[in-house]
Amino acid sequence: MLALISRLLDWFRSLFWKEEMELTLVGLQYSGKTTFVNVIASGQFSEDMIPTVGFNMRKVTKGNVTIKIWDIGGQPRFRSMWERYCRGVNAIVYMIDAADREKIEASRNELHNLLDKPQLQGIPVLVLGNKRDLPNALDEKQLIEKMNLSAIQDREICCYSISCKEKDNIDITLQWLIQHSKSRRS
């Protein structure tokens, strides 16, 4: 009986108390940022993505949480914009092409440079190693090591290995994001 009442209360709350969160999605070009947004928004995967020029904003609703996603271009000329769009968000999602080992060092440097900005202090970070379905893709343990994530001490940091194409670990990624809809923004 108590479980039924609890479920009814949760349902009732979901009708009237909607959560909103804002996140910024950054990472080097061709890591799969826009594809990730499309997969969580509609479940659609496409091989033929056009690189993001500047930024895109999209709202995605999952349950009673509306996620406002800033998808920022990853080409070198757009990286100076990353900090501006990361200020005041609930979480930063940093996407890596886990199968492109040649770009890992550049990706690590960009992530650490971004997180060194004082205005972004304390904002939780979710690092996603995309394209785990490809041969030689780094797994979570390798990503944590190669990206030197253990050196990041001033905030919560989490790392998942995902595949937008196969939709691997998209569910746990969404769970993490929804949990952080309650994170305070400054």
Swiss-Prot record:
Catalytic activity: GTP + H2O = GDP + phosphate + H(+)
Pfam families named in the record: Arf
Intramembrane region(s): 1-19
Entry EC number(s): 3.6.5.2
Residues annotated as signal peptide: none
GO function term, MF aspect, one: alpha-tubulin binding
Tissue distribution of the protein: Ubiquitously expressed.
Enzyme class: hydrolase
Subunit note: Interacts with tubulin. Interacts with BORCS5; recruits ARL8B to lysosomes. Interacts with VPS41; the interaction mediates the recruitment of the HOPS complex to lysosomes. Interacts (GTP-bound form) with PLEKHM2 (via RUN domain); the interaction is required to recruit the motor protein kinesin-1 on lysosomes. Interacts (GTP-bound form) with PLEKHM1 (via RUN domain); the interaction is required for PLEKHM1 localization to lysosomes and for ARL8B function in delivery and degradation of endocytic and autophagic cargo in lysosomes. PLEKHM1 and PLEKHM2 compete for interaction with ARL8B.
Free-text function comment from the UniProt entry: Small GTPase which cycles between active GTP-bound and inactive GDP-bound states. In its active state, binds to a variety of effector proteins playing a key role in the regulation of lysosomal positioning which is important for nutrient sensing, natural killer cell-mediated cytotoxicity and antigen presentation. Along with its effectors, orchestrates lysosomal transport and fusion. Localizes specifically to lysosomal membranes and mediates anterograde lysosomal motility by recruiting PLEKHM2, which in turn recruits the motor protein kinesin-1 on lysosomes.
PANTHER family for the chain: ADP-RIBOSYLATION FACTOR-LIKE PROTEIN 8, ADP-RIBOSYLATION FACTOR-LIKE PROTEIN 8B
Record protein name field: ADP-ribosylation factor-like protein 8B
Organism expressing this protein natively: Homo sapiens
Phylogenetic lineage: Eukaryota, Metazoa, Chordata, Craniata, Vertebrata
Gene behind the chain: ARL8B
